[in-house]
């Protein structure tokens, strides 16, 4: 083929996304021309290109193709847009376990004909029929199972000739049977590549086909290598066992041969009895000879020469010798065996010839060589006597040593140790007070070891074996201090100035007194009352809030005839005894007749009531409420409805004090008011605000004694009559007329949304005695559990789900895990606007609204006070109040809160948070 035709073929294949190598293409075209011969003239270029593609599918991609781009296999996220051709290296089904695939590949049906004793044709007809039925059922079950079972996901190993990467089949794109090594696939669309893995589906790839014979692989070997399982382990084990058995047999044969060769020069009997020469066959029997001659006279020639035994002398210097006094166990000297003596005798036989040289005659007889036991005992006795003498003479341990038996005559002096039984070891005695002769035991009455102060009736002591008696633990017990009363340091006390009445000469000067503000629980009021007796002049609680002035430079005295008197403090200590009797009884705070008299006392405001102009000049911070113990005691009684119990303590005339004005001094004005009311019908005493018959009383709810701060007596449907306006003072009418403007419909709806419903079920816990957190006694645990149960804490999610079954709104107690503020604090000019997200264990991020009354109690000021500051351009004070409000709102982030939430049965209404407390305050724990 000419170069022009080859270039045209190369460009045509490139348009088909086959970027072949030019050299491989030329060789491939030459091979095709040689195969076709003369028919090549009738073949078009496109037909030649198709033949080249078929030849490429059966060739290695590394030899024929140039990769269009280098794929970054280490990239985390890549999208391949170009069309690329890859070659399959291997494929694995990752939908099933590799072990299951390996077991299927290695499974084979064993022929058990040898076990049955013949082929299946020899069986009876019944058995053949049964076997056919079972085989057919098994075949049908297998076919059904194979038909139902779907092929799983394939993991394919691919290469583009340079890079090797893996592909995961998301859909059933390829057939597992045709995924042979060397097959080619092409990418047709956008393919995602994640960490070197291509994600393939039907829309982005196609199968081209092909196969390379040289790239075939064994699937069983692939699975076994992946699982690291050696399938030939049993064969290798059998081969190794056979080799070991053959080696052991060869070793045994070699041992037997060696043993046989060694026994050629030995007799089967004892060599001492018979000696046989295997070479010549001669047998020699040695002559029996006695070891020791029995004759009384021994000839010198008949005595064998005994070689001298050389005793090795120690070569180490004396400094390295072991002079320890410990006994080293030694085995007795072994006696030489009899055959050793016999060998010596045989080595030196008796000689009868006189011409032989004679050995030197023995100096003693043989009988004298026998060791006598008596002589040994005598020698040992002498040795012991010498040792004792040496020990008595020496006095230092360093001077004595033990020498061997042959050198006792040269031994040094040895220190003696007296082991007499009469001598006793001296024991160091400690002082008597440091010694406890016996362990802890129960002392008896009259024990001299006890002090005179501790001698008492021992039977009273509670004895424990582990700790001892109570009298030993008295010093460790300390009386717990009562921490319910806290004395405030003077640095935290605010100094205020009270204005005294000019009529009293003693109180004309300004009196510097301290108004103590005490937070937390109150107890021991009597102690505080004794401390407060030093105050010279008692003023009314609210006197220091408002200062009555006639002009800016001088003080004016009120028209009161008598100075105000301090009402008696309610003694809470007496009420603690009988609180249990009145646990379910809640009395109203005051009678209605007293309230009417108080309203009458405010009728004439010209003399006693301070004008609004003078009120503006009063330097008074309404956000700070200062109270004394007296005031807080009465507030606590009013809060829990215990005002009625002090009827036997507080006199009637002292109850008629309203803001420092005595009702008894306004009799004339009451008479004028009564005379003006003569022309009008008198109201009923039972219902003073109505001239109509009394309507029926709404019965209280079942849980009305649990209402807490929201407690009120049973409601009455009271119709307000026209006579009420005459009771209200004129200044209050004026203020009300100016402040109360008729809002529009939208303002009324917003106002109703931000207030509690009139008909609502409330769940509250009864008043309980405050517990001390430092008390760890087990008696308080049941009380805490009971109080926790009385709180009736519910999951917020249950309340929101079950409210569709309610007929009215309910107040539920929830324990949030976290609360987060949605927006900044806002106001519409009347109420506060604040929404928070509440999350507990049952629900997450529920939007709730916080009531205005709760925010007023938390902040200490309301919206109206902020408006007044804004109108007066007091920006700094307004900014300070805003910062204080934001700081106090951080308390919603606490993790120990309890929320009282009003939940409406309507789903479109947001839950309203009415109260918030910590768990310790809710359980009344100090």
UniProtKB/Swiss-Prot annotation:
Lineage top rank: taxon: Eukaryota
UniProt subunit comment: Component of the RMI complex, containing at least top-3, rmh-1 and rmh-2. Component of the BTR double Holliday Junction dissolution complex composed of at least him-6, top-3, rmh-1 and rmif-2, which is involved in double strand break repair in the germline. Interacts with rmif-2; the interaction is direct and is required for mutual stability and localization at nuclear foci. May interact with him-6; the interaction is required for mutual stability and localization at nuclear foci. May interact with top-3.
Swiss-Prot/TrEMBL GO biological process terms: chiasma assembly; DNA replication; double-strand break repair via homologous recombination; larval development; positive regulation of brood size; positive regulation of DNA recombination; positive regulation of embryonic development; positive regulation of reciprocal meiotic recombination
A Pfam entry, by short name: RMI1_N_C
UniProtKB keywords: Chromosome, DNA damage, DNA repair, DNA replication, DNA-binding, Isopeptide bond, Meiosis, Nucleus, Ubl conjugation
Annotated GO MF terms: DNA binding
Cross-link type Glycyl lysine isopeptide (Lys-Gly) (interchain with G-Cter in SUMO2), residue numbers: 428, 654
Family classification: Belongs to the RMI1 family.
InterPro entries xref list: RMI1_N, RMI1_N_C_sf, RMI1_OB
Residue ranges of the region described as Disordered: 734-755
Tissue expression: Expressed in the germline (at protein level).
Record's protein name: RecQ-mediated genome instability protein 1 homolog
Gene Ontology CC terms: chromosome; nuclear body; nucleoplasm; nucleus; RecQ family helicase-topoisomerase III complex
Stated role: Essential component of the RMI complex, a complex that plays an important role in the processing of homologous recombination intermediates to limit DNA crossover formation in cells. Component of the BTR double Holliday Junction dissolution complex, which is involved in homologous recombination during meiotic double strand break repair in the germline. Promotes top-3 binding to double Holliday junctions (DHJ) and hence stimulates top-3-mediated dissolution.
Main location: nucleus
Organism of origin: Caenorhabditis elegans
Localization per record: Nucleus; Chromosome; Nucleus, Nucleoplasm
């Amino acid at each position: 083929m000419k170069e022009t035709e080859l270039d045209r073929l190369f460009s045509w294949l490139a348009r088909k996304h086959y970027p072949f190598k030019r050299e491989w293409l030329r060789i491939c075209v030459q091979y095709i021309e040689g195969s076709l011969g003369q028919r090549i003239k009738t073949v078009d270029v496109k037909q030649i290109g198709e033949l080249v593609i078929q030849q490429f599918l059966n060739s290695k991609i590394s030899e024929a193709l140039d990769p269009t781009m280098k794929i970054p296999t280490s990239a985390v996220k890549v999208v391949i847009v170009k069309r690329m051709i890859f070659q399959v290296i291997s494929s694995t089904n990752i939908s099933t376990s590799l072990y299951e695939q390996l077991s299927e590949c290695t499974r084979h049906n064993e022929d058990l004909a040898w076990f049955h004793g013949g082929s299946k044709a020899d069986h009876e007809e019944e058995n053949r029929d049964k076997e056919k039925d079972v085989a057919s059922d098994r075949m049908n079950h297998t076919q059904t199972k194979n038909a139902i079972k779907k092929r799983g996901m394939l993991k394919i190993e691919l290469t583009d000739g340079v890079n090797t990467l893996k592909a995961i089949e998301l859909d059933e794109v390829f057939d597992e049977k045709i995924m042979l090594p060397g097959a080619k696939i092409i990418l047709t669309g956008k393919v995602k590549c994640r960490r070197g893995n291509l994600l393939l589906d039907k829309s982005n790839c196609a199968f081209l086909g092909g196969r390379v014979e040289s790239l075939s692989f064994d699937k069983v070997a692939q699975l076994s290598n992946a699982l690291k399982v050696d399938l030939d382990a049993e064969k290798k084990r059998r081969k190794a066992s056979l080799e070991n058995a053959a080696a052991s047999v060869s070793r045994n044969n070699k041992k037997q041969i060696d043993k046989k060769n060694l026994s050629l020069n030995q007799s089967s009997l004892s060599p001492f009895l018979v000696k046989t020469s295997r070479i010549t066959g001669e047998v020699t029997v040695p002559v029996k000879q006695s070891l020791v001659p029995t004759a009384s006279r021994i000839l010198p020639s008949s005595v064998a020469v005994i070689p001298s035994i050389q005793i090795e002398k120690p070569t180490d210097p004396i400094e390295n010798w072991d002079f320890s006094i410990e006994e080293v166990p030694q085995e007795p000297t072994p006696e030489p065996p009899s055959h050793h003596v016999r060998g010596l005798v045989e080595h030196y036989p008796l000689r009868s010839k006189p011409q032989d040289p004679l050995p030197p005659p023995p100096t003693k007889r043989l009988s004298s060589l026998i060791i006598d036991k008596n002589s040994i005992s005598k020698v040992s006795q002498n040795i012991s006597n010498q040792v004792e003498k040496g020990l008595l003479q020496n006095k230092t341990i360093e001077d004595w040593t033990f020498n061997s038996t042959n050198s006792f005559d040269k031994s040094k002096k040895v220190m003696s140790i007296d082991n007499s039984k009469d001598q006793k070891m001296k024991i160091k005695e400690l002082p008597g007070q440091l010694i406890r002769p016996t362990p802890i035991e129960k002392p008896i009455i009259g024990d001299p070891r006890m002090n005179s102060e501790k001698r008492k009736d021992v039977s009273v002591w509670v004895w424990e074996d582990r700790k001892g008696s109570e009298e030993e633990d008295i010093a460790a017990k300390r009386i717990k201090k009562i921490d319910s009363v806290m004395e405030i340091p003077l640095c935290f006390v605010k100094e205020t100035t009270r204005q005294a009445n000019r009529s009293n000469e003693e109180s004309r000067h300004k009196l510097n007194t301290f108004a103590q503000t005490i937070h937390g629980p109150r107890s021991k009021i009597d102690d505080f009352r004794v401390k407060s007796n030093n105050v010279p002049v008692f003023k009314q609680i609210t006197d220091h809030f408002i200062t009555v002035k006639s002009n800016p430079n001088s003080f004016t005295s009120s028209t009161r005839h008598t100075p105000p008197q301090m009402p008696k403090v309610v003694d809470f200590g007496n009420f603690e005894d009988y609180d249990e009797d009145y646990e379910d009884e809640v009395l109203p705070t005051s009678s209605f007749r007293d309230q009417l008299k108080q309203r009458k006392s405010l009728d004439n405001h010209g003399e006693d009531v301070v004008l609004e102009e003078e009120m503006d000049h009063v330097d008074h911070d309404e956000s700070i409420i200062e109270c004394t113990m007296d005031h807080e005691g009465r507030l606590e009684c009013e809060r829990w409805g215990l005002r009625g119990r002090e009827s036997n303590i507080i006199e009637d005339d002292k109850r008629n004090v309203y803001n420092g004005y005595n009702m008894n001094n306004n009799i004339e004005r009451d008479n004028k008011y009564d005379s003006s009311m003569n022309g009008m019908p008198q109201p009923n005493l039972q219902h003073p605000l109505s001239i109509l018959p009394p309507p029926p009383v709404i019965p209280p709810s079942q849980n009305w004694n649990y209402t807490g701060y929201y407690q009120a007596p049973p409601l009455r449907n009271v119709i307000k009559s026209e006579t009420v306006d005459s009771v209200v003072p004129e200044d209050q009418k004026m203020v009300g007329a100016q402040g109360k403007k008729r809002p529009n419909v939208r303002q009324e709806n917003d106002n109703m949304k931000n207030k509690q419903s009139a008909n609502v079920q409330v769940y509250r816990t009864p008043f309980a005695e405050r517990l001390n957190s430092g008390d760890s006694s087990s008696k308080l645990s049941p009380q805490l559990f009971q109080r926790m149960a009385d709180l009736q804490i519910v999951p917020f999610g249950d309340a929101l789900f079950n409210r569709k079954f309610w007929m009215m709104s309910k107040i539920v107690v929830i324990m949030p895990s976290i609360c987060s503020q949605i927006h900044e604090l806002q106001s519409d000019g009347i109420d506060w606007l604040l929404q928070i997200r509440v999350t507990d264990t049952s629900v997450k991020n529920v939007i709730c609204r916080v009531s205005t009354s709760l925010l007023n109690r938390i902040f200490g000021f309301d919206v109206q006070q902020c408006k007044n500051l804004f109108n007066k351009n007091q920006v700094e004070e307004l900014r300070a109040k805003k910062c204080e409000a934001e700081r106090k709102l951080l308390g919603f982030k606490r993790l120990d809160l309890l929320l009282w939430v009003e939940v409406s049965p309507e789903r479109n209404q947001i839950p309203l948070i009415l109260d918030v407390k910590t768990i310790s305050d809710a359980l009344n724990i100090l």
